[in-house]
């Protein structure tokens, strides 16, 4: 993980911890694909999975939008993947 990309990971983690009921179960893994895209894999506890996805995927979409907006400011491409 490159130190310059840590703010994106930290942003996603901070936003998610404010949404879930069990913030200690939130983890974000980060790696970079060959084309330079930063991939953030978000994992939450089983009880919080539905809360992070939201009705119709709205919460997940909002999280992705905020992180992508931050990535644009840093001239990065980012992909947020919510893993179960």
What function would you assign to each model-found segment?
Residues 1-49, 62, 66-84:
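RNA-contacting regions in translation and RNA-metabolism proteins
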Residues 53-57:
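Glycine-centered tight-turn and secondary-structure capping sites
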